[in-house]
């Protein structure tokens, strides 16, 4: 992959849990590529959503020690977008102009703000293009 790309929360849920083995391999490869290439990006929101799921829905729930390891080894190298006035403004515009939910618009705005060309997610419409950003579902 030559361009920067953004990973949505569900990629990490599949990569770091045992819940859906069929998606774990694909998600794990994307996370590995993101870290190894230095071209993968996540936002504060992805980290927050991931840990919310990991602590409440993983079976068994992720332990604090596992969370510390995931934060240091997986998320720290990728975390590049934090909340800002401009991020919220762009997300509001995306919600208004594209009928995207608020939380999804924050993800899209974060990907755009970090100049990503691809947003990997299964929650948005595969193939949709928003400016220079293309949505891609890696599980299709």
What residues fall within each predicted segment?
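Glycine/small-residue-rich phosphate/adenosyl-binding loop
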Residues: 47, 59-75, 82
């Amino acid at each position: 992959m030559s361009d920067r790309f953004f990973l949505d929360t569900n990629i990490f849920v599949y990569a770091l849990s045992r819940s859906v083995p069929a998606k774990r391999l694909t998600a794990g490869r994307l996370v590995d590529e993101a870290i190894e290439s230095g071209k993968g990006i996540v936002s504060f929101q992805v980290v927050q959503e991931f840990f919310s799921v990991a602590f409440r829905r993983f079976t068994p729930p992720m332990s604090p020690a596992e969370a510390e390891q995931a934060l240091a080894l997986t998320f720290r190298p990728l975390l590049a977008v934090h909340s800002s006035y401009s991020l919220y403004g762009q997300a509001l515009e995306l919600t208004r102009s594209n009928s995207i939910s608020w939380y999804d618009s924050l993800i899209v705005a974060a990907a755009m703000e970090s100049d990503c060309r691809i947003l990997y997610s299964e929650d948005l419409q595969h193939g949709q293009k928003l400016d220079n950003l293309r949505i891609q579902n890696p599980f299709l």
